[in-house]
């Protein structure tokens, strides 16, 4: 009998252990909301996923919570929050507004805590009708600030206030505001080091070469805290790229991309569920350590994914991977250079990247006529975008949904830099020394005014690096070294800049020996 009892206890222990293994590893939140226990579990899963920007899966969990308890107000709040992608500049306004309509009657009910009512009020502000997106973002931030002052110990209010600060910056980075977000996230982590949102938002707050070291602990922790969120596995590489830690960049994005494949298989999804963002960063990591063949195969695989499941998204990432590979490998005679990609439906910056790559290939082939044609095409696209941005600033759009293809001043500024790079390449090809140098110097100044571009650079060939390459052809080696070194200020341990310094130094020594 004792043996039977012992056997049953062992089975029970093993069963419990197996159950623990099946639990999603998404981090830890301490937030009890009004609703039954079954719905609470679904809500908590949705909240954890929301903090890791796994918006589709978070929405699925929140909708599940609504079914389990139709009176759980916070489940509707969560659904509405999944339609607003703060850092990504995306919002499905119509879907979010419909979710808010389901939630509004809960706001003043005595059934819900003041914290719940406060968060419901905040999301209603986020989807205020007939109000421009930036105004809503700022109003939401201010609302969250007031909640934070009232409930400074509430970790969820603190976390969402931190991310609202980042979301209130219309374009690029604002170090002062991002610093505020970081300080709030750090306070949450002091109490709960496994909070996925605080870890995530701290990384975003310090995501540039000048601050990245301040988030290295968060980067090292986040993927361990929330390994079942693909984005949590990718996010540490933001800090690793900023610090030039290429092995870590590679490992992070191998894990993140594999997690997306696991999810794709589990949910029986098509290629659009692949983590192309992590895939692109992985390619960039390989190229920084000279793994050209691995990177090339990735571009070829991306081409096959785009053919199997054609979409604007796959075309965009194919263009990204093509451009990154060619710039970083300098293998312009590769078959990759001959890939034709339809970029007509992509946002302006993606089009400009593609036209720059086509122009650089024409430069290598000494085809000035093609460069001039590309300059005309890109100039026309910039003019169109400028008109759209002007209309938006004049109030022609208010509550329409936003996506990354929406016209922005940042897109124009980035594209003007690539346009000037094309003009400089044309001048270089025509041996117009004065015009080429003036264009490159002017463009460097323009690029310095841009916010830091995390990850694979948006300006795929940094202008200071391009200028340094040109200076070498003019035998101005010390100036070239200076420009390559300047490139490293925003691109830590960038391989081409480091190799450029080495090359210019050797040529300089040889030149002195010949004298």
Question: What does each model-identified segment do?
Answer:
Residues 14-15:
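C-terminal motif of bacterial Sec signal peptides marking the signal peptidase cleavage site
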Residues 42, 76, 83, 118, ...:
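TPR repeat positional signature
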Residues 38, 45, 79, 121, ...:
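Structural register within alpha-helical repeat arrays
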Residues 72-73, 154-156, 195-196, 229, ...:
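Residue-level recognition of tetratricopeptide repeat
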Residues 55-57, 79-113, 121-135, 168-176, ...:
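Inter-helical turn/loop elements of alpha-helical hairpins
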Residues 67-68, 108, 148-150, 189-191, ...:
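Solenoid-like repeat scaffolds
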């Amino acid at each position: 009998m004792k043996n039977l009892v012992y056997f049953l206890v062992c089975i029970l222990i093993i069963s419990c252990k197996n159950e623990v293994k099946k639990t999603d590893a998404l981090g830890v939140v301490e937030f009890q909301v009004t609703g039954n226990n079954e719905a609470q579990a679904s809500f908590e899963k949705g909240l954890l996923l929301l903090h890791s920007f796994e918006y589709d899966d978070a929405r699925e969990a929140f909708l599940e919570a609504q079914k389990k308890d139709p009176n759980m107000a916070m489940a509707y709040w969560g659904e509405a929050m999944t339609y607003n992608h703060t850092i990504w500049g995306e919002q499905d306004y119509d879907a979010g507004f419909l979710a808010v309509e389901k939630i509004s009657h809960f706001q003043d009910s005595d059934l819900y805590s003041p914290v719940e009512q406060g968060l419901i009020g905040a999301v209603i502000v986020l989807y205020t009708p007939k109000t421009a997106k930036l105004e809503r973002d700022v109003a939401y931030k201010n609302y969250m600030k007031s909640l934070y002052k009232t409930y400074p110990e509430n970790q969820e209010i603190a976390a969402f206030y931190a991310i609202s600060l980042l979301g209130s910056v219309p374009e690029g980075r604002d170090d002062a505001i991002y610093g505020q977000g970081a300080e709030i996230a750090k306070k949450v982590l002091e109490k709960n080091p496994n909070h996925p949102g605080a870890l995530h938002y701290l990384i975003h707050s310090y995501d540039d070469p000048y601050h990245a070291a301040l988030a290295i602990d968060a980067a090292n922790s986040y993927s361990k805290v929330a390994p079942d969120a693909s984005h949590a596995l990718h996010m540490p590489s933001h800090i690793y790229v900023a610090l030039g830690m290429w092995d870590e960049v590679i490992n992070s994005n191998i894990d993140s991309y594999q997690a997306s494949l696991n999810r794709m298989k589990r949910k029986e999804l098509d290629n659009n569920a692949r983590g192309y963002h992590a895939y692109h960063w992985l390619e960039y990591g390989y190229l920084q350590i000279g793994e050209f063949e691995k990177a090339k195969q990735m571009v070829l695989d991306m081409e096959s994914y785009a053919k199997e499941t054609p979409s604007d998204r796959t075309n965009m990432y194919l263009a990204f991977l093509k451009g990154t590979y060619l710039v970083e490998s300098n293998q312009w005679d590769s078959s990759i250079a001959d890939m034709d990609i339809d970029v007509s439906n992509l946002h302006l910056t993606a089009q400009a990247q593609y036209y720059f790559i086509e122009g650089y290939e024409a430069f290598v082939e000494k085809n000035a006529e093609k460069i001039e044609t590309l300059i005309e095409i890109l100039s026309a696209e910039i003019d169109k975008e400028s008109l759209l941005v002007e209309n938006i600033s004049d109030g022609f759009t208010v509550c329409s949904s936003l996506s990354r293809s929406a016209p922005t001043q940042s897109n124009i500024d980035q594209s003007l830099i690539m346009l000037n790079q094309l003009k400089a390449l044309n001048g270089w090809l025509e041996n117009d020394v004065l015009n080429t140098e003036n264009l490159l110097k002017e463009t460097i100044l323009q690029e310095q005014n841009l916010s830091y571009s995390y990850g694979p650079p948006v300006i795929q060939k940094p202008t200071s690096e391009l200028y340094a390459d040109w200076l070498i052809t003019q035998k101005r080696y010390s100036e070239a070294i200076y420009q390559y070194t300047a490139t490293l200020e925003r691109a830590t341990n960038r391989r081409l800049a480091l190799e450029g310094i080495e090359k210019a130094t050797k040529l300089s020594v040889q030149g002195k020996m010949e004298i």
